Amino acid sequence: MKTVYFVRHGSTEGNEEGVYQQVHTPLSALGRRQAACVARRFERIPVDIVITSDMARAAETGRCIAERNRLPIVFDPLFQEILRPAIVRGQRRDTPEALEMRRFLAENWTNARVKHSNEENFFDLKQRALKALAHLVARREKTVLVVTHGTFLCMLICCMMAGEEVSPPWFDRLHHFLVLKNTALSVCEYDQGKWQLVIWNDHTHLG
């Protein structure tokens, strides 16, 4: 059996101020405190390796956990957050330009042939999640800690449940239902070809 501990990255100023994140957005002061809290939690949880998204906010969270617990760490773009168009990154979500882009993305979320620029649509995100799950299954480690992002982790859970059958309406409903705090811990197990969600959104380490 393989156990995968998923941790969402710590908070950023973008999270706190309603701004679309940049790839290089670092943790805020609050996010660094959250990362330290979850790192202490893993003093009591044996883990073979830390795999983290290479986006700065996740990489910083993963590095904090790995350094405190003397664990090997791998930075993997497979576990990045859903990619938004470059034009909105760094913008507040309530600007006219961002609202118009949000409308465009919503209208074309399920259209595999239409994109504004370099963003991911539903099909891109699903295929990357399926690839990430296959990668985790193939790794030799039995206990893995993955530091990733809220929307991508939701898609991972959907793909664990339904694989290629995940549909846009199904994902959208689950995405709004599965609330995830910054640095919250979720645990999944893989055994005999099947995934099981054991713990979701455990943030007791934050007090």
Feature annotation, model-predicted:
Residues K194-G207:
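Acidic, His/Gly-rich catalytic cores of divalent-metal-dependent hydrolytic chemistry
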Residues E16-V19, P85-R89, C158-M160:
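Short aromatic-enriched loop/helix-cap "lid" or pocket-rim segments at secondary-structure transitions
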Residues C37-T110, K181:
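Phosphate-coordination/substrate-recognition cap region in phosphate-metabolizing enzymes
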Residues D54-M55, L78, V146-T151, W200:
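Short, well-ordered beta-to-alpha junction loops that form the rim of enzyme active sites
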Residues K131-K194:
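Active-site-adjacent alpha-helix immediately C-terminal to a catalytic or transition-state-stabilizing loop
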Residues R102-D124:
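Short glycine/proline- and acidic residue-enriched helix-loop micro-motifs
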Residues R8-C64, N118-L130:
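Loop-to-helix element that buttresses phosphate recognition and phosphoryl-transfer chemistry
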Residues M1-Y5:
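Extreme N-terminal starter segment of soluble prokaryotic enzymes
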